[in-house]
């Protein structure tokens, strides 16, 4: 876990329970004598998220409707800290902060977690985009409960399912960074199979096919969890569409959960003729994932960008700064025929 992650040492359940009486009701003592919750219980996971967002990030009244993704907060915070380090590589090892740093969140969701964390940690401003109008309405209600966010978090509907960047930006809009947690699965059946497997691993087998659907403990459905072609197809489409706005975002980034997708993504980046691409490894416990980042701006353009946009912005040096990024491996060779 990232060293600046507020949960890097684990959940402080005593402090979180003091923040939220609703969470306190779900906290149990394990056989090992430690505090925990039932992570297979969606209500408990939601209360944990609400308490974390209030205790660590000052977010009041966070909530999501039934059926929407309830993401693990530490993993989302790792993404934000990792891209902050990425920006620092272009800013003399200082993380640019404040609302002048503009971040485009593709698929902001009903939970709006990335803007909440990014604004609290670094003061960044966000444009959150989604195809789901109900999700955007819930995100707007979170802003309504936290009016101090209204000037720094904007929400926008993307009405065309296959469009990611296409038709999205308005005249003159530029962003220092784009972020995305792409749909992971290829189909609803794929979602169901993974959900069933998770429940089986928890010794909670769930319902058989044809009965009530077993649920992922983090919820979610529809555009949040699946698209045709899954994660690989979505990220490839993002890369293709980024070619049409190459200098309006300095660093494009996306989470990439499946390591075997990397050769296909490398091939797409090569085809797009990006100036530079990197992978940024991330790990939470036994879970291994990574970010893929790419830019169409050369070193000189990035230095000009820094001078024009960040020199007047507050920033701070990254403690014991060490780049955890690396170019996509040149020796990785994609299959001859890409099935997606």
Swiss-Prot record:
Catalysed reactions listed for this entry: adenosine(1618) in 23S rRNA + S-adenosyl-L-methionine = N(6)-methyladenosine(1618) in 23S rRNA + S-adenosyl-L-homocysteine + H(+)
Annotated GO CC locations: cytoplasm
InterPro entries to which the protein is assigned, alphabetical: METTL16/RlmF, rRNA_lsu_MeTfrase_F, SAM-dependent_MTases_sf
Enzyme Commission number, as recorded: 2.1.1.181
NCBIfam families tied to this protein: PRK11727.1
Described purpose of this protein according to its UniProt entry: Specifically methylates the adenine in position 1618 of 23S rRNA.
Name this protein carries in UniProt: Ribosomal RNA large subunit methyltransferase F
Species whose genome carries this gene: Dechloromonas aromatica (strain RCB)
Lineage: Bacteria, Pseudomonadati, Pseudomonadota, Betaproteobacteria, Rhodocyclales
Gene assigned in the entry: rlmF
